[in-house]
Regions:
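N-terminal Rossmann-like NAD(P)+-binding subdomain of aldehyde/semialdehyde dehydrogenases
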Residues: 1-132
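Donor nucleotide-activated moiety binding/catalytic core segment of transferases
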Residues: 135
Length: 135
């Protein structure tokens, strides 16, 4: 039985502010396979605050650094493919081949597309202020 009751907030694993255990059921067997904690309003507020604070530095992060982080994420995702398939199969009750070919592949495809789009995306555009082609 997996027991994962902590939340990842502001760069560290933290206990929930109030205990609120929840059994996660494998739909294919009807048996519980994990116990997680459902967050409270206080936990949600902490996570939102941390995300807002993180955005202050993230918005200044260079395109190159963002690409590097996304490519690292993509490598780790693919290296842990079998774990992702197993987790998705267990959580949704899907056959392993379906979880691999559909759900896990979708995550990999989205990751690759985000990287591709970011490589070609220009965050800034210099307008010719002397031309008549203004908005």
């Amino acid at each position: 039985m997996i027991k994962n009751k902590n939340f990842y907030i502001n760069g560290k694993w933290v206990s929930p502010s109030k205990p609120n255990d929840f059994e996660v059921i494998d739909p294919s067997t009807g048996e519980p396979f994990a116990i997680i904690s459902l967050g409270s309003t206080e936990d949600t507020d902490k996570a939102i605050s941390a995300a807002k604070n993180a955005f202050e530095t993230w918005r200044e992060t260079s395109k190159e650094k963002r690409l590097s982080l996304l490519e690292k994420f993509d490598q780790i995702y693919n290296r842990r493919w079998d774990e992702m398939v197993k987790a998705q199969s267990t959580e949704m009750g899907a056959p392993l081949d379906y979880a691999s070919e559909t759900h896990t592949k979708m995550g990999a495809d989205i990751s690759k597309n985000i990287i591709k789009i970011l490589k070609d995306f220009n965050f800034e555009h210099q307008f010719d202020l002397k031309s008549n082609n203004r908005i």
